[in-house]
Design a protein with these regions (language model features):
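Soluble metallo-hydrolase cores and metallopeptidase-like ectodomains found primarily
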Residues: 1-35
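Active-site/substrate-binding loop(s) of hydrolase catalytic cores
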Residues: 25-168
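Gly/Ser/Thr-rich active-site loops/lids in small-molecule metabolic enzymes
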Residues: 165-182
């Protein structure tokens, strides 16, 4: 797990000097936005892992070279990046982990509602999803944005990609989708 932030740009109001036990704030005292990114839920979606790695590399190198755009983002945002969740699946080039469980279906949200998936014996039965859940609930419980990198199809899913209800901020998601789709891939 990588945590990337500009620790010099803000204040550590709870425990100055103890970076592990404090929350990071913008220079104006407001809480930084928190973004959590994970890659490699499905081991055979290698580009999902690579995308998470490239995001981490971009911000680490940009911070190191003093890239002003990167420094501005990191002065206002705390990034948490899990590059590869499913190491077994990556090694065996399969969607599932070594226990033949689809980690993306092993969370407690609508667990075991898809007949065609292998969700595991119970929600969080797999160490990978349990550890990811603990991290998300204990370290980034108030994340402003969660991005999970998948590369099986070219779609953008947002809460909830499977159900007909739209989230209250659906216009924002549609705007992001339209912006991404407007990029030329020639």
């Amino acid at each position: 797990m990588l945590q990337i932030s500009d620790w010099n740009g803000g204040a550590c109001s709870d425990s100055p000097g103890d970076i592990d036990d404090c929350k990071h704030y913008k220079s104006n005292g407001e809480r930084k936005e928190v973004v959590y990114i994970d890659g490699g839920h499905h081991g055979n979606e290698h580009l999902g892992t690579e995308l998470a790695f490239l995001v981490a590399e971009y911000y680490i190198q940009g911070w190191g070279t003093g890239d002003q755009q990167v420094l501005e983002i990191l002065s206002n945002t705390e990034l948490h990046i899990l590059i590869m969740l499913n190491a077994d699946g990556n090694d065996f080039d399969t969607r599932w982990n070594v226990n033949q469980v689809d980690l993306n279906r092993n969370y407690d949200h609508y667990w075991n509602t898809c007949d065609s998936t292998q969700p595991g014996s119970s929600a969080f039965s797999e160490s990978e999803t349990l550890a990811n859940s603990i991290y998300m609930n204990e370290v980034v419980p108030d994340a402003d944005l969660y991005i999970t990198m998948h590369t099986g199809v070219w779609i953008m899913l947002y809460p909830w990609g499977k159900w007909p209800e739209q989230p209250s901020d659906w216009e924002m998601y549609h705007h992001i989708r339209d912006e991404v789709n407007s990029v030329s891939y020639t």
